[in-house]
Amino acid sequence: MRTTTRRAPRVGIGGPVGSGKTMLCLKLCQRLRERLSMAVVTNDIYCSEDAQFLIRQSALPAARIAGVETGGCPHTAIRDDTTMNEQACRALEATFPELDLLLVESGGDNLTATFSPELVDAFIYVIDVAEGDKIPRKGGPAIRFSDLLIINKVDLAPLVGADLEVMARDATAQRGGRPFLLCDLKREHNLDAVIGWLEREVLFARTAAPVG
């Protein structure tokens, strides 16, 4: 009898280089791993540094963390040709059929980066205030259409002259009612709100137990 592997709920995490994508993966794993079965797929162009970071930090057991070396443009691997990421996700789902949540971290990319809906069920886009308070105003598909926008590293705003009120106003204008959060992920400021969003918008979709 043929059996099929249950697809785990998948959440994409995108954003520019250094914005805090891997930190978000780490913090979510640390906070949720005791009550959820989790795995992570990371993307880098020429290495697996983000996967190795998560392994060194003991975010999850190493077998639950897979690093994809895309060898090219990051958004191609999450939107245009998702084959490598899909294979990595399916391998983890086959090994851990009880998965409650699978995170897919993109390589660092620009404001046009979005995830294919065939690869993930929802996606979070992470920017940081050190990039300048004009970033939300620039718009682009990632700013406008991500399911959740995180404006990270709010603790740095006074040091770089970024106006958080301006960033919040512009994010509101760009996103048409879609949620955004001001966070300091390293210190877990507003991490509870991110987890609350995951619980409401993604984890409710947890499917039945695997077959076979």
Swiss-Prot record:
<comment type="function">
    <text>Facilitates the functional incorporation of the urease nickel metallocenter. This process requires GTP hydrolysis, probably effectuated by UreG.</text>
</comment>
<comment type="similarity">
    <text>Belongs to the SIMIBI class G3E GTPase family. UreG subfamily.</text>
</comment>
<dbReference type="GO" id="GO:0005525">
    <property type="term" value="F:GTP binding"/>
</dbReference>
<feature type="binding site">
    <location>
        <begin position="15"/>
        <end position="22"/>
    </location>
    <ligand>
        <name>GTP</name>
    </ligand>
</feature>
<keyword id="KW-0342">GTP-binding</keyword>
<dbReference type="InterPro" id="IPR004400">
    <property type="entry name" value="UreG"/>
</dbReference>
<dbReference type="InterPro" id="IPR027417">
    <property type="entry name" value="P-loop_NTPase"/>
</dbReference>
<dbReference type="GO" id="GO:0016151">
    <property type="term" value="F:nickel cation binding"/>
</dbReference>
<keyword id="KW-0996">Nickel insertion</keyword>
<keyword id="KW-0963">Cytoplasm</keyword>
<dbReference type="GO" id="GO:0003924">
    <property type="term" value="F:GTPase activity"/>
</dbReference>
<dbReference type="GO" id="GO:0005737">
    <property type="term" value="C:cytoplasm"/>
</dbReference>
<protein>
    <recommendedName>
        <fullName>Urease accessory protein UreG</fullName>
    </recommendedName>
</protein>
<dbReference type="Pfam" id="PF02492">
    <property type="entry name" value="cobW"/>
</dbReference>
<dbReference type="GO" id="GO:0043419">
    <property type="term" value="P:urea catabolic process"/>
</dbReference>
<keyword id="KW-0547">Nucleotide-binding</keyword>
<comment type="subunit">
    <text>Homodimer. UreD, UreF and UreG form a complex that acts as a GTP-hydrolysis-dependent molecular chaperone, activating the urease apoprotein by helping to assemble the nickel containing metallocenter of UreC. The UreE protein probably delivers the nickel.</text>
</comment>
<keyword id="KW-0143">Chaperone</keyword>
<dbReference type="InterPro" id="IPR003495">
    <property type="entry name" value="CobW/HypB/UreG_nucleotide-bd"/>
</dbReference>
